[in-house]
Regions:
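Alpha-helix boundary/interfacial micro-motifs
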Residues: 26, 114, 145-146
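A surface-exposed partner-binding patch
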Residues: 1-108
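Compact, glycine/acidic-enriched structural inserts
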Residues: 124-148
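Structured loops at beta-to-helix junctions and adjacent beta-edge loops in soluble globular domains
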Residues: 102-104, 115, 126
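Broad, structure-driven detector of short, well-ordered beta-strand segments within folded domains
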Residues: 108-116
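A short alpha->loop->secondary-structure connector
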Residues: 119-121
């Protein structure tokens, strides 16, 4: 994997490309555990980074499939569906500026969110029934894990 990678017109962070290259020979399986059970903002976080997508084809395939999995259905995509959880983001219904880069052990997605900044995406995670911002950057995100 090169140190520059663009998916759907969005350039992924160089630090992500370096980590993906490190685990490319393992098909992206990294099984990184949290150092502490908290996200970059101090909120509780219980997950691990099981796999990162280490090739462009897989990144594009998984990213393009997000629109098929997260469809407004009367609950998901409704304006007030997650208003009770202060850590949750509004349901995403337009994934043009989202790139899925990995999964936790339970299959929940880790994604880059380029909606607010095209140069430094935040990291969001699908937590059971809502999206949640867990880091301001990939560099912050990867510092949450041991052996990265």
């Amino acid at each position: 994997m090169s140190n520059q990678l663009t998916i759907n017109g969005l350039q992924l962070p160089a630090s992500y490309c370096a980590l993906a290259a490190k685990y490319e020979g393992f098909d992206g399986f990294c099984n990184l555990k949290l150092k502490n059970p908290k996200d970059s903002f101090g909120y509780p976080l219980e997950c691990e980074l099981a796999q990162i997508y280490s090739n462009e084809q897989k990144l594009k395939e998984i990213t393009d499939s997000l629109n098929n999995y997260f469809v407004p259905d009367g609950y998901y995509g409704e304006l007030d569906s997650n208003d009770t959880d202060p850590e949750s983001l509004k349901d995403i219904t337009d994934f043009k500026k989202i790139v899925c880069f990995g999964i936790a052990g339970d299959g929940s997605q880790f994604c880059f969110d380029f909606r607010d900044c095209a140069n430094v995406p935040t990291v969001i995670w699908w937590e059971d029934d809502h999206w949640r911002k867990i880091s301001n950057s990939f560099e912050e995100f990867i510092c949450l894990f041991s052996n990265s």
